[in-house]
Swiss-Prot record:
Protein name: Protein-S-isoprenylcysteine O-methyltransferase
Topological domain spans for side Cytoplasmic: 64-73, 117-135, 179-216, 249-288
Function: Catalyzes the post-translational methylation of isoprenylated C-terminal cysteine residues.
TM region(s), chain numbering: 13-29, 46-63, 74-91, 97-116, 136-153, 159-178, 217-232, 234-248
Binding site for S-adenosyl-L-methionine: 194, 201-204, 209, 214-217, 255
GO cellular component labels: endoplasmic reticulum; endoplasmic reticulum membrane
Domain of life: Eukaryota
Gene: icmt
Family: Belongs to the class VI-like SAM-binding methyltransferase superfamily. Isoprenylcysteine carboxyl methyltransferase family.
Lineage: Eukaryota, Metazoa, Chordata, Craniata, Vertebrata
Annotated disulfide bonds: none
Major localization class: endoplasmic reticulum
Catalysed transformations (reactions): [protein]-C-terminal S-[(2E,6E)-farnesyl]-L-cysteine + S-adenosyl-L-methionine = [protein]-C-terminal S-[(2E,6E)-farnesyl]-L-cysteine methyl ester + S-adenosyl-L-homocysteine
């Protein structure tokens, strides 16, 4: 029964994300709005408010309790994804921000969906990673503030299309690598570092794990940096790079203590052959 409930949550998330993303159809359904006026003009914003209210009402009718909590989060991410798409096809200086919103919303939604597919026993509302940490939230807010200020005082900085494209490629690479890592690890993957070995816990060394010891962290690292390259945010690019490097350095060391405890010599041999994948991060240092 638990498995069926969790699988249902995955299906609910797909439906809800799609409903939220359907906001992109508003300019197609009426000649009153274009992509630009829907997001920028007052009538368009009013239409978005009505869309959100109608969507929330529909979700309240369809789902109760825990399923509604899943649905409202997935639909919010879908709505953000749809608005990001609308923004990305405009000719405004905010076009790169549209790409960014699509990347951010899809990252959080796909974290939940892949967990539902891969490791339903660990699935929870927290699998969306929307409440990852205070530091994560502040980092996101900082990038939005920097983009807004620089767009206002120096809009040409945000018109370096080739740089934004490089950032988008980094984001896509990081996203694909992380999800490949999650799918390859299967039920071994968990958003929380495990300190106790479960009966089903095995050492995964195939697929992307034959390239890097920590491919999910490598993906997240380059995804994070790529978002700031995409936005042409020079200040946050430096900050994100340093903060991400420090976070993953500490996280990998913590995780590898557990992995050595779980798998002993097998992990030590694997560690000798395969790099972490992150620059200047070696993992746990073992005494000779």
């Amino acid at each position: 029964m638990a498995g069926a409930r969790l699988l249902q949550e995955g299906r609910v998330s797909i439906v809800s994300f799609t409903l939220g993303a359907s906001v992109i159809s508003l300019p197609l359904l009426t000649s009153s709005f274009t992509e630009q006026t829907l997001l920028a003009a007052a009538p368009g914003r009013i239409a978005l408010v009505f869309f959100i209210a109608a969507l929330n009402g529909l979700l309240l009718l369809l789902y109760k309790a825990q399923l509604y909590q899943v649905a409202i989060r997935a639909s919010f991410l879908g709505f953000a994804f749809g608005c990001g798409l609308l923004l990305s096809i405009t000719q405004s200086p905010w076009k790169p921000f549209g790409w960014y919103v699509c990347s951010l919303s899809f990252f959080h939604y796909s974290e939940y969906l892949v967990t539902a597919m891969n490791n339903p026993r660990s699935l929870s509302i927290d699998s969306f990673l929307l409440n990852h940490s205070l530091e994560y939230t502040l980092a996101a807010l900082s990038s939005w503030v920097e983009f807004t200020i620089e767009t206002t005082i120096y809009p040409d900085l945000k018109q370096i299309t080739w740089l934004s494209v490089i950032g988008l490629i980094m984001v896509l690479f990081g996203e694909v690598l992380r999800k490949c890592a999650m799918l390859t690890a299967g039920s071994n993957f968990n958003h929380i570092v495990q300190n106790e070995k479960s009966d089903s816990h095995t050492l995964v060394t195939s697929g992307v794990y034959s390239w890097f010891r920590h491919p999910s962290y490598v993906g997240w690292f380059y995804w994070s940096i790529g978002t700031q390259v995409l936005l042409c945010n020079p200040l946050c690019l430096v900050g994100y790079t340093l903060a991400s490097w420090r976070f993953f350095s500490e996280r990998i060391e913590e995780e590898e203590f557990s992995l050595i405890h779980f798998f002993g010599e097998n992990y030590l041999e694997y560690k000798k052959k395969v790099p972490t994948g992150l620059p200047f991060i070696k993992g746990v240092k073992m005494e000779p």
